[in-house]
Amino acid sequence: MEKKQFVISVYTENHVGLLNRIAIIFSRRKINIENLNTFPSGSEGIHRFIICIRETEEAVQKLVKQIEKQVEVLQASYSI
């Protein structure tokens, strides 16, 4: 499968250490984060992460499922 550019969007509760746990999910799979932005969403106490990577769609699907397993993660999705 061909690697493509993907954008992963993650909505989370604002908790200390969550960014580190999400980054570990990427590093265990040897996936490089090309771009990462985090900012408050429109709801109080909720933050949004925008993560850009270059990977196969199959790997991204598995990655998003793993991110969603984190307790503080409310929603994770990806797009091309």
Annotate each language-model stretch with its function.
Residues 1-80:
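A conserved regulatory-domain signal marking ACT and ACT-like small-molecule sensing domains
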